[in-house]
């Protein structure tokens, strides 16, 4: 073999060996740096959130809702000191302890000019703030502190106290939310005979859309104010 060629091959092997050693050294250095970070500054510990139950007599016993979603916390060690990376947030579930709130019955509709209604359109119930609501002056909606803009309902207040929030579902009304602010003789008499009748307020008797729907479900979302 040519001596010059042999020397060239030897030099090439030495060069490749140097590259391999250099690469290994850099890789090893990277491993050491990573190990140091994990070992001293980035040792993380997950702190699992807990579930806290709160009981509310204003909610029907058939309702359970999440008030606050839970978030796991994260802590880490830095120079021997435990620090918080993410604060733990406990999950909060509200459970109803009030009366069971599912009913079936009939939905009727009425205007403030109905027979026997207050001539000024005032409802039977006072609002949460103690004021009086007029269907003719203030309209057929009420701004509830929890549910926002809702329709006004008339119901038997011995069963559905003033301020009760009800969701109405039937073939014409899908998920309508209303608040009990009124009552009437028809609701009282219906309850005494064993069935549920709730009246939905309209601007006038002439604007009533549907005289009666006897296949209506009523879901109480909150009992009273």
Annotated model-derived regions:
Residues 2, 7, 26, 36, ...:
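Detector for Asparagine
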Residues 3, 21-24, 77, 133, ...:
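Intrinsically disordered, low-complexity segments enriched in Ser/Pro/Gly/Ala and basic residues
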Residues 30-101:
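Extracellular modular ligand-binding repeats in secreted and cell-surface proteins
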Residues 96-225:
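Solvent-exposed, well-ordered loop and adjacent helix/strand elements within mature globular domains
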């Amino acid at each position: 073999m040519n001596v010059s060629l042999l020397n060239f091959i030897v030099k090439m092997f030495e060069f490749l060996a140097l590259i391999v050693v250099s690469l290994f050294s850099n890789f090893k250095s990277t491993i050491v740096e990573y190990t140091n970070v994990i070992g001293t500054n980035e040792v993380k510990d997950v702190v699992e959130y807990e579930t806290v139950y709160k009981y509310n007599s204003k909610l029907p016993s058939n309702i359970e809702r999440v008030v606050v979603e839970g978030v796991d916390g994260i802590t880490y060690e830095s120079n021997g000191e435990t620090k918080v990376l993410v604060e733990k947030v406990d999950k909060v579930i509200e459970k109803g302890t009030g009366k069971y709130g599912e009913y079936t019955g009939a939905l009727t509709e009425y205007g403030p000019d109905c027979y026997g209604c207050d001539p000024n359109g005032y409802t039977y119930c006072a609002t949460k703030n103690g004021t009086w609501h007029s269907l003719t002056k203030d309209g057929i909606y009420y701004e509830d502190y929890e549910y926002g803009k809702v329709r006004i309902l008339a119901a038997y207040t011995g069963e559905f106290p003033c301020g009760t929030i009800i969701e109405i579902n039937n073939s014409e009304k899908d998920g309508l939310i209303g608040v009990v602010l009124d009552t009437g003789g028809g609701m009282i008499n219906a309850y005494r005979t064993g069935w549920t009748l709730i009246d939905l307020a309209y601007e006038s008797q002439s604007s009533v859309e549907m005289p009666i729907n006897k296949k209506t479900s009523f879901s109480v979302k909150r009992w009273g104010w």
